[in-house]
A protein has these predicted regions:
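Extended, polar/charged low-complexity intrinsically disordered and coiled-coil segments in eukaryotic
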Residues: 3-12, 16, 133, 141, ...
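Flexible, active-site-proximal loop/turn residues at the rims of small-molecule/cofactor binding pockets
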Residues: 35, 83, 137
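Short glycine-/acidic-enriched loop or helix-start segments at secondary-structure transitions
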Residues: 41-43, 69-70, 88, 140-143, ...
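Generic beta-sheet signal
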Residues: 60-62, 79-82, 134, 154-157
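Short gly/pro/ser/thr-enriched loop/turn and capping motifs at secondary-structure boundaries
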Residues: 65-67, 83-87, 158-164, 168
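Phosphate/nucleotide-donor binding subsite
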Residues: 75, 79-128, 185-186
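Conserved nucleotide-sugar donor-interacting segment of glycosyltransferase catalytic cores
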Residues: 112-182
Length: 187
């Protein structure tokens, strides 16, 4: 089954989108992310690419990013948690701690509003053909299952496990991460 998403590689000059095949049906695709602009920008880029191919794209993220998303001509729907905390230096210091930061994000930012995130995503995916979510969006697979729509988890986080052959570089343990690469998939 094709959802109209096609990856293209080109070694020559780019082919204008108007000259590309348009045999794919128009789809409504919801992309969801939370966190900093570094977390959001990959989904904005995907949304712009899909929009250029005539798909309806919705970025579902924190309310604090509404103006940025809508200024690009991309659909926006709010999903909690709102990421306005990224502008608070005290909160950022706490969640960027090399040892405890990730745990704090999960325990203090994501899990307390998991039910609200689920409810917001249920509303955002109304009529959607596909849900694309960041790895740490725990409500996404539940929403996709409830709605009966396909779900894709996109991983762009440097600490995420992208491959059994390429373990992540752990903050504060760069040397250890590099030295464990010889283990390959055993690590």
């Amino acid at each position: 089954m094709s959802w109209g998403v096609r990856l293209e590689a080109s070694v020559g000059p780019a082919v204008p989108i108007t000259q590309r095949s348009t045999n794919y049906p128009r789809s409504r695709i919801v992309l969801t992310s939370h966190g900093s602009l570094g977390d959001l920008h990959p989904y904005v880029a995907i949304a712009l690419g899909l929009k250029a191919r005539d798909h309806e794209t919705i970025v579902a993220t924190g309310e604090c990013y509404r103006k940025k998303i809508e200024a690009l001509g991309i659909g926006f729907l709010p999903v909690r948690p709102d990421s306005d905390w990224v502008t608070n230096p005290d909160v950022m210091r706490r969640i960027m701690h090399p040892r405890w930061g990730l745990e704090r994000v999960i325990r203090e930012v994501l899990l307390p509003v998991l039910r609200e995130t689920y409810e917001d995503l249920l509303a955002a995916t109304e009529g959607a053909d596909l849900l694309v979510a960041m790895q740490a969006n725990y409500a996404s697979p539940l929403v996709a299952e409830t709605k009966g729509i396909p779900w894709a988890s996109a991983m762009h986080l440097p600490i995420g496990l992208a491959s059994a052959y390429d373990p992540p570089v752990l903050p504060g343990f760069v040397g250890l991460s590099r030295n464990l690469r010889f283990l390959g998939p055993a690590f």
